[in-house]
Curated annotation (Swiss-Prot):
Protein name: 3-hydroxyacyl-[acyl-carrier-protein] dehydratase FabZ
Organism whose genome encodes this protein: Methylobacillus flagellatus (strain ATCC 51484 / DSM 6875 / VKM B-1610 / KT)
Localisation per UniProt entry: Cytoplasm
Keyword Lipid metabolism part of the UniProt annotation: yes
Residues at the catalytic site: H47
UniProt xrefs under CDD domains: FabZ
Keywords of this entry: Cytoplasm, Lipid A biosynthesis, Lipid biosynthesis, Lipid metabolism, Lyase
Main location: cytoplasm
Gene Ontology molecular functions: (3R)-hydroxyacyl-[acyl-carrier-protein] dehydratase activity
Gene3D superfamilies, A to Z: Hotdog Thioesterase (3.10.129.10)
GO cellular component terms, semicolon-separated: cytoplasm; membrane
Catalyzed reactions per annotation: a (3R)-hydroxyacyl-[ACP] = a (2E)-enoyl-[ACP] + H2O
Amino acid sequence: MDIHEILNYLPHRYPFVLVDRVLSLELNKEIVAVKNVTINEPFFPGHFPYHPVMPGVLIVEALAQAAAILSFKTMGTKPNDKSVYYFAGMDNVRFKKPVSPGDQLILKVSIDRILRGIWRYKGEALVDGAVVAEAEMMCILKAID
């Protein structure tokens, strides 16, 4: 799935789109996606000017965006102006190695369970085959009031 199709399944837009490509997706199961990290990212001038490191919360956000694509594809729907897909929580988040400009994040997310409209996922972010972050995440689709 290229960026044009990804934008059909994410409500996010620049500078907050954190998924560049989907390598594989199995409905109701898992997604493998890519975030190419470049020196041009808007957060690097402030995090940190002399030693740029991708903020860990944005790595988890990239995992959550991959999860959103998986969920919308699984539901057979797309984001719209009547509902919002909220990031509802995270557990067991671990950052194991820093992510730097030039790295390619491989985002692996699997559906753990869906209960009463709450989706639970397990996610891993890898660089060069090594896990750099992992998290359990929860999301929920809610109507806009």
